């Protein structure tokens, strides 16, 4: 088992800076776990990555934001979070299958902070998505831009989808739109492919949990891009049931086109 050094307390960091630091720290640990355990037993590797990254993040959040609640994929869901004004929604290892496969770099670490606002519009205010196997690059709400994405609406829309579970609605909207499906692993890697301009959209309709999309959605919206349910309604977080049935993340200019095609497909 990798035993990371005790982290320095960083109480002076802003929430956005802390999110980025947590994502990078967990990413470094996951790379160490990968190197130490190897790929001979994928289940053992994935379990170790999930568990150790989760322990690191929970330990740091307890030390550095002791009054905040946490919703993690790898921890018991303490429903006291429903009364909290600040909830960290984290996925210590997004894409366990990809993490456990040699040569795959499309896995991520998700860190998001949900805050209850006084105007009745709670939202993800700070978030970071790390792609550890790609140089541990971290996409963060306080610095992200959409500059890498191409301008305008392309003739063919490149849409990131699951390699194993492509959404059925995709086949229906292909009747009216020119679409090129692009298979990418984890949810975070798919969403950041939109930020990087590698794809135009990320569409999912097979069901997810809040930790799968909270950080990617926060980063997307901070970059001026679009993130919603497939019917165009907002993505809601810190709900009693953290299940989210579907989502669309895309460049802002293609959102009306895709939402319209999806609505037509459902009629």
From Swiss-Prot:
One GO process term, biological-process aspect: sulfate assimilation
Residues annotated for substrate binding in this entry: 73, 93-96, 212
E.C. designation(s): 3.1.3.7, 3.1.3.11, 3.1.3.25
Conditions for induction: When comparing gene expression levels of the four IMPase family genes in exponential cultures of M.tuberculosis, the level of cysQ is the highest, almost equal to sigA; impA and impC are expressed at approximately 40% of this level, while suhB is lowest, at 12% of the cysQ level.
Cofactor(s) in the UniProt record: Mg(2+); Mn(2+)
Catalytic activity: adenosine 3',5'-bisphosphate + H2O = AMP + phosphate; beta-D-fructose 1,6-bisphosphate + H2O = beta-D-fructose 6-phosphate + phosphate; a myo-inositol phosphate + H2O = myo-inositol + phosphate
pH dependence: Optimum pH is 8.5-9.5 for PAP phosphatase activity, 9.3 for IMPase activity, and about 10 for FBPase activity. IMPase activity shows a dramatic decrease at low pH. In contrast, IMPase activity is highly stable at alkaline pH, with more than 60% activity remaining at pH 12.
Keyword vocabulary terms for this entry: Hydrolase, Magnesium, Metal-binding
Cofactor comment: Mg(2+). Mn(2+) can substitute for Mg(2+) for PAP phosphatase and IMPase activities, but is less efficient (50%-60% of the activity observed with Mg(2+)).
Keyword Magnesium: yes
GO CC field: plasma membrane
Activity regulation info: PAP phosphatase and IMPase activities are inhibited by Li(+). To a lesser extent, PAP hydrolysis is also inhibited by Na(+) and K(+), with IC50 values of 150 and 250 mM, respectively, so much higher than IC50 with Li(+) (0.5 mM). Exhibits about 50% residual IMPase activity at 5 mM Li(+) and about 10% at 30 mM Li(+). Na(+) and K(+) have no significant effect on IMPase activity between 0 and 200 mM.
UniProt cross-references to InterPro entries, sorted A to Z: CysQ/Inositol_MonoPase, Inositol_monoP_metal-BS, Inositol_monophosphatase-like
Pfam families: Inositol_P (PF00459)
One MF term in the entry's GO annotations: cobalt ion binding
Functional pathway: Sulfur metabolism; sulfate assimilation
Enzyme class: hydrolase
Thermal dependence summary for this entry: Optimum temperature is 62 degrees Celsius for IMPase activity. After preincubation at 70 degrees Celsius for 2 minutes and then being assayed at 37 degrees Celsius, more than 95% activities of IMPase and FBPase are lost.
Residues involved in Mg(2+) 1 binding: 73, 91, 93
Disruption phenotype: Strains lacking this gene show normal growth, do not require exogenous inositol for growth, and show no differences in levels of phosphatidylinosotol mannosides (PIMs), lipomannan (LM), lipoarabinomannan (LAM) or mycothiol (in the absence of exogenous inositol).
Binding-site positions, Mg(2+) 2: 91, 94, 212
Free-text function comment from the UniProt entry: Phosphatase with a broad specificity. Its primary physiological function is to dephosphorylate 3'-phosphoadenosine 5'-phosphate (PAP) and 3'-phosphoadenosine 5'-phosphosulfate (PAPS). Thus, plays a role in mycobacterial sulfur metabolism, since it can serve as a key regulator of the sulfate assimilation pathway by controlling the pools of PAP and PAPS in the cell. To a lesser extent, is also able to hydrolyze inositol 1-phosphate (I-1-P), fructose 1,6-bisphosphate (FBP) (to fructose 6-phosphate (F-6-P)) and AMP in vitro, but this might not be significant in vivo.
Binding partners and assembly: Homodimer.
Similarity comment: family membership: Belongs to the inositol monophosphatase superfamily.
Name of the protein: 3'-phosphoadenosine 5'-phosphate phosphatase
